A protein has these predicted regions:
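Hydrophobic helical h-region of N-terminal Sec-dependent signal peptides
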Residues: 9-18
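Hydrophobic beta-strand segments within beta-rich accessory/binding domains
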Residues: 46-52, 92-111
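Bacterial Sec-dependent N-terminal signal peptides
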Residues: 4, 17-46
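Tryptophan-paired
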Residues: 67-104
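Short, surface-exposed binding/anchoring microloops in extracellular/periplasmic proteins
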Residues: 34-67
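Exposed low-complexity, polar/acidic, P/S/T/G-rich flexible segments that act as propeptides
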Residues: 109-130
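Bacterial N-terminal signal peptides that target proteins for export
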Residues: 1-10
Length: 184
């Protein structure tokens, strides 16, 4: 009888151990965790491109202001014919760029027979999901301009563009929708 009782207890312990081990399952909880919707916007991206001509580089101090990923305005001198940057910021976000200009020290535009203001820009802004899928509206534009003027007209032209020759600014809401805004 003792042997039978011991065998029954051992069998019960074995069965309880088996039930406990199979009841735990795997440590992989990812199967039950809901995955984020791939259409939920999480960030805004803005790709910028600016170009300028030789006359502008030689006569003017050119400064680029843009919003960085932290929402702060950064400033960079433009010392080459082209400039490109891509900024990614967590939503909601403000993204934009502006090209400011002033005469270089000692520059005398009136002494020039002709000044050519050649410049171009493009931008492409959009919201992305966690998997970098484009969601929301896309904002983009671009143009190339060439304006020839007599040297004595350069100062007046600069005065008309004190707040920036090229400027655009967009506010991206938490839902990924972008609306245009103004530089202050």
């Amino acid at each position: 009888m003792k042997k039978t009782l011991m065998a029954a207890v051992a069998l019960m312990l074995l069965m309880m151990t088996a039930v406990a081990l199979t009841g735990c399952g795997s440590d992989d909880d990812d199967n039950n965790t809901p995955k984020p919707d791939d259409t939920t916007p999480v960030a805004a991206v803005m790709d910028y491109s600016l170009t300028v001509g030789d006359d502008m580089l030689s006569l003017l101090n050119l400064t680029i202001e843009y919003y960085d990923a932290d929402g702060k305005v950064q400033t960079e001198p433009l010392t080459q014919k082209s400039w490109k940057k891509s900024v990614r910021a967590k939503l909601p976000a403000t993204l934009g760029v502006r090209l400011k200009m002033q005469l270089k020290d000692g520059a005398d535009p009136a002494s020039l027979a002709q000044f050519t203001a050649a410049y171009g820009y493009s931008y492409n802004g959009y919201a992305v999901s966690a998997t970098d899928k484009v969601v929301g509206n896309v904002v983009n534009s671009g143009t190339d301009q060439t304006l020839a003027m007599q040297g004595d007209k350069v100062t007046t032209w600069l005065e008309h563009h004190t707040d920036g020759l090229v400027k655009f600014l967009y506010n991206f809401a938490a839902n990924g929708q972008a609306t245009s805004s103004n530089w202050q």
